[in-house]
Amino acid sequence: MLKVCRESVQREPEGVQSRIQLVQADMRSFSLAQSFKLVTTPFRTFQHLTAVDDQLSCLVSIHRHLVEEGTLILDIFNPSLEALVRDNLGQEFGDEPEFTTPDGRRVIRRHKIVSKDSFNQINHIELLYYVSHPDGREERLVHASPMRYLYRFEAEHLLARCAFEMQQVYANYDKSPYGSKYPGELIFLAKKVKS
């Protein structure tokens, strides 16, 4: 992902490039030499932390890097009870619209749940990428990883334990109020408070 991001940054004007610093680090414990007004955890990255201690360590590291009253935007999915109990292990689902890359490849992304650990709230998932190359070659790429799902009040409790104060919870990136779309997203806006 950093490679793709670096390529994207190189296409930006010099003034933008000079303000961007890419850092590869462990989100559970990182140390940068600066503080920020805003920290985001996009694309459900927080849910790849499958142990509560790791989640707390991550939030403590983020807290340490925010200025006083800085904002954290935490993005996770809102677990659908119907989906959690569905007997769909090994079945592909979630057709997303096909997209075309700049080099002409057509890509369809799907999902698959390989195993479920309901007691620890962990699904082992695969993201499947079906790629059609301009030369006619077909390719299937698989990215496997565990994802721990959290419910709203569990996430709020973790944030409170790490000295964050809830400001808002949204159901989507369009700022739809929580509960207006189900299952939707859980997007938390939390403010750093003194620990």
Regions found by a protein language model. Give the residues of each.
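Conserved hydrophobic residues forming the short capping helix/wall of the S-adenosyl-L-methionine
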Residues: 9-13
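SAM-dependent methyltransferase
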Residues: 74-156
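C-terminal lobe and adjacent flexible extensions of AdoMet/dcAdoMet transferase-like proteins
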Residues: 142-195
